[in-house]
Amino acid sequence: MRVTDFSFELPESLIAHYPQPERSRCRLLSLEGPTGALTHGTFTDLLDKLNPGDLLVFNNTRVIPARLFGRKASGGKIEVLVERMLDDKRILAHIRASKAPKPGTELLLGDDESIHATMTARHGALFEVEFNDPRPVLDILNAIGHMPLPPYIDRPDEDADRELYQTVYSEKPGAVAAPTAGLHFDEPLLAALREKGVEMAFVTLHVGAGTFQPVRVDTIEDHIMHSEYAEVPQEVVDAVLVAKVRGNRVIAVGTTSVRSLESAAQAAKSDLIEPFFGDTQIFIYPGYQYKVIDALITNFHLPESTLIMLVSAFAGYQHTMNAYKTAVEQKYRFFSYGDAMFITYNPQAIFERP
């Protein structure tokens, strides 16, 4: 399969730079996987689409203020984007500079350059940086970091983004990008879903900056997926297995929840799914056999991205590309701060290729 098979024309005007004033008032395009039928509505229509006993699986990662600005002690300006916190003193990061720093280079970070750090080692495209500061890394990032808005949101981050670019149920700091399907859930909607009898479980996947990296090969089978840390605890496994036995659906909120659950299913030795704690490089594209997910809530993704490939593997290539064409025609808002889709599984998708 070719990467260009997953291309589509997207007018710049449809890229959302700010979220809707109310989280749950975004538009919702529903795609019936088996038939390809489309219906238009608003996000709160989920109340009618979900049944008592259905299980929603959320990603409770919390976005850290991962973008830092500063300079090398020798003078050159740098921009640091944290990929992962290694411990209380060290980070793994992308560094943008006119000349890449060498191990031992002193860095002065923050708007006032008050935070001192040292680049200690290089690991491929990533740099290991150690802070010379008594505070834990997370405290330093909260003090001097900027919210790492995606590259297609072409504006500086604002104070409001610290709340808006965060799900209301975020709990475990570590992501450098929000699990954006979850941004549409507010407390009243969550309460209404609980009242209806919809069950909820929480995995953790710390979204890395690699999620925004373009696919740089022509043939998708040649693509090497970036690695991200995921946790699927026993209580999530139990909730999934009980829902399946009851005949209810497992509904992933976002592609990161999909990748967490399917990673746990892939690694399982004896059951459908077992607890999973570790790095995952799972790459889902047409031909993949889904093991756990029955429905998916997700935003609209970039052309030629691994995420539109994941959706195509779930709903079928033709149904997915037709839905995207319709979304553009109907002027849905795209990407992280944009509108959402509700998609049911197409069992025939595994046999379909572009």
Curated annotation (Swiss-Prot):
EC number in record: 2.4.99.17
GO biological process terms held by the UniProt record: queuosine biosynthetic process; tRNA wobble guanine modification
Matching InterPro entries: QueA, QueA_dom1, QueA_dom2, QueA_sf
Organism annotation: Salmonella newport (strain SL254)
Name of encoding gene: queA
Name of the featured protein: S-adenosylmethionine:tRNA ribosyltransferase-isomerase
Metabolic or biological pathway: tRNA modification; tRNA-queuosine biosynthesis
Gene3D superfamilies: QueA-like
Keywords of the record: Cytoplasm, Queuosine biosynthesis, S-adenosyl-L-methionine, Transferase
